[in-house]
Design a protein with these regions (language model features):
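Short active-site segment of divalent metal-dependent hydrolases/proteases
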Residues: 74, 85, 125
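Short extracytoplasmic/periplasmic juxtamembrane "stem" segments immediately C-terminal to an N-terminal membrane anchor
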Residues: 1-14
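Transmembrane alpha-helices of multi-pass inner-membrane enzymes
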Residues: 108-120, 124-154
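Active-site-proximal flexible loops/turns
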Residues: 30, 48-50, 89, 126-129
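Short, flexible micro-motifs
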Residues: 44-48, 85-88, 133
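Hydrophobic transmembrane alpha-helices and their immediate junctions
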Residues: 57, 80-113
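Long extracytoplasmic/lumenal interhelical loops at the membrane interface
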Residues: 11-36, 40-81
Length: 154
């Protein structure tokens, strides 16, 4: 059964890929990798070769020639680190949301919501810019005093 209800038999010609059907294909292949490696993952060093192998198995020539990542941070984390890494990523988001709501910090909540939603359609931590951006702003909002007027325009 397909997790994303996308059949790899329905692969369009290379000229007919769009952001939606491309991501559905990438997510379907990612779910296959997760099914085969759910406990411990495959490790960061095997990510590219494993994706290429599964693209080849599924006759996904467009993915094979373009070396796409999963375009979903949660799936990518699950592939690389297994269930423990996925659980840790979800834990980071949940505890951060809980903190933002307890502080009644609207800007932190908006930041986390935006980053969370963006992570569904992009591998945000695949490059160091995403890691630095998330780490910096999460730390900034976390350690900002609750009564801070830094957001206020006078």
């Amino acid at each position: 059964m397909s997790l994303f209800d996308y059949s790899m038999e329905d692969i369009p010609p290379a000229a007919n890929w769009n952001p939606v059907n491309l991501r559905l294909a990438l997510w379907e292949i990612s779910s296959q990798i997760i099914r085969d490696n759910w406990l411990a993952g495959i490790g960061i060093s095997r990510m590219d070769e494993t994706l290429q192998d599964y693209y080849s198995r599924n006759n996904f020539e467009f993915g094979l020639s373009n070396h796409f990542n999963p375009h979903n941070q949660f799936l990518q984390t699950f592939i690389i680190l297994g269930i423990a890494g996925f659980a840790l990523l979800v834990f980071i988001f949940l505890t951060s949301f809980k903190l933002a709501l307890s502080k009644k910090d609207v800007l932190m909540t908006v930041f986390l919501s935006t980053f969370f939603l963006f992570s569904i359609s992009e591998s945000t931590f695949a490059v160091n810019k995403g890691v630095v951006f998330f780490s910096f702003f999460l730390s900034f909002f976390t350690f900002l005093p609750e009564k801070s007027t830094i957001y206020l325009i006078k």
